[in-house]
Amino acid sequence: MLYKIGQIIRENNNYIKNVGIIIENPILVNEYTVNENLSYLKKMSKNSNDINLDEWYKFFGIEEYKNTLFSKLSLGTKQKVGLIQAFMHKPHNLILDEPFNALDKGTVEKVQKYLLEEKEKGTLIVFITHINDSILNYCDEVIEIENGKIIKINKK
């Protein structure tokens, strides 16, 4: 359930549609192709007419996989599809759980550049990672948690 200042907002579709989420191992429908999965999600977006999936496939270099079943993809390609799913509707808020998991160096650099551009536009980015170096350029604040407790807060 989603809360904002003690208020349940789960029913507020406008707020929910403004959040892009990627989890460590993206989960989509295994029996659907990449294009079927993302086209379905695209239809649910308020700005679906502005989403060009072919541009995202090109950005991530996965044009050749768009008609491949999600279950047949490598972990790195699944991660790219998960990132498209999180980014394609240009959300105001991003929650990224280990977004660079299984990605090659070139893709990591492209995603880092994209995230810096989105941050400059005012996108709120919440990073969940074990690799501190991968987030330092994006963060105004880093909160380190160990065993469920905050152990350190670093602010720029």
Stretch-by-stretch model annotation:
Residues 69-75:
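Conserved ABC ATPase signature
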